[in-house]
């Protein structure tokens, strides 16, 4: 009789523990979006379906936005359950205007359906395309932002304050993402640092590679321009010596 009573108590305990585990499981919104948007702050809809997570997992929502002057905006957005990370809200501006802009927002939270941001109005507040009066007349750069690769990259005038042309390729993986984004344009950033040498955005990993030819071309032009007067000066000195064999003395 005592053994049966113990088994009964154990069964009740297991049922309560099982019910407690189910209660503890978190529900999160889940979606992955990769798109080009004209005005993501006003038009992007970030509502998603809900799924039950495994015990101990958190909710996360992460978005990365990249834009060049005169182009649409690339949006990479992810919502999911995650097993790693702690509760935190992060906003990072990797590259600031004028020229190219790259920013991200990330929210890791521990309550059911807490990754519930439905728009980017509070995240994307980038100024409108730079006015023509603020454009530099001396620098032009190929300009495009595209999913995959740029089919065309027209040469566009750069805004005052930009320092170089950027040409880079970003490869994303993780967080349900597997995508490549090509970016070209005027920027204030020096070198291959559109993402400020940061290799992760929320659950996504990032690999940034660049064409350094575009960084070197302006410098090569300057060197060539500085050497030309020297070459002409040397030729001017050598010219009388070259004429000596042709001179006849009486």
UniProtKB/Swiss-Prot annotation:
Disruption phenotype: Knockout Tex101 mice are viable and show no overt developmental abnormalities. Males are infertile. GO terms for biological process: binding of sperm to zona pellucida; fertilization; flagellated sperm motility; regulation of flagellated sperm motility. It comes from the Eukaryota. Detected in testis and ovary. Expressed in spermatocytes, spermatids and testicular spermatozoa, but not in spermatogonia or interstitial cells. Expressed abundantly in testicular germ cells (TGCs) but mostly disappeared from epididymal spermatozoa. Residues 225-250 form a propeptide. Residues 1-25 form the signal peptide. The keyword Lipoprotein applies. Keywords: Cell membrane, Cytoplasmic vesicle, Glycoprotein, GPI-anchor, Lipoprotein, Membrane, Secreted, Signal. InterPro entries: Fert-Immune_med_protein (IPR051899), LY6_UPA_recep-like (IPR016054). The keyword Iron does not apply. Its main location: membrane. It is a lipid-anchor; GPI-anchor. Glycans are attached at residues 45, 110, 134, 160. Plays a role in fertilization by controlling binding of sperm to zona pellucida and migration of spermatozoa into the oviduct probably through molecule adhesion ADAM3. May play a role in signal transduction and promote protein tyrosine phosphorylation. This is Testis-expressed protein 101. It comes from Mus musculus (Mouse).
């Amino acid at each position: 009789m005592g053994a049966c009573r113990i088994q009964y108590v154990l069964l009740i305990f297991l049922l309560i523990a099982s019910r407690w585990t189910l209660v503890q499981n978190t529900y999160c919104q889940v979606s992955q979006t990769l798109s080009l948007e004209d005005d993501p702050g006003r038009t992007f809809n970030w509502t998603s379906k809900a799924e039950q997570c495994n015990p101990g997992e958190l909710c996360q929502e992460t978005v990365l936005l990249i834009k060049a002057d005169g182009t649409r905006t690339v949006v990479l957005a992810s919502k999911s359950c995650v097993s790693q990370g702690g509760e935190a809200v992060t906003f990072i501006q990797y590259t600031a205007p004028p020229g190219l802009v790259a920013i991200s927002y990330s929210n890791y939270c521990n309550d059911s359906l807490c990754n519930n941001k439905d728009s980017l109005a509070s995240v994307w507040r980038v100024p409108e395309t730079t006015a023509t009066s603020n454009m530099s007349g001396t620098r032009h750069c190929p300009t495009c932002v595209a999913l995959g690769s740029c089919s065309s990259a027209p040469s566009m005038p750069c805004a005052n304050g930009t320092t170089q042309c950027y040409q880079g390729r970003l490869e994303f993986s993780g967080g349900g993402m597997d995508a490549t984004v090509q970016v070209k344009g005027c920027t204030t950033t020096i070198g291959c640092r559109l993402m400020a040498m940061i290799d992760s955005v929320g659950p996504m990993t990032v690999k940034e590679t660049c064409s350094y030819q575009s960084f070197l071309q302006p410098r090569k032009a300057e060197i060539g321009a500085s050497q030309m007067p020297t070459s002409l000066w040397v030729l001017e000195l050598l010219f009388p010596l070259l004429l000596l064999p042709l001179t006849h003395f009486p």
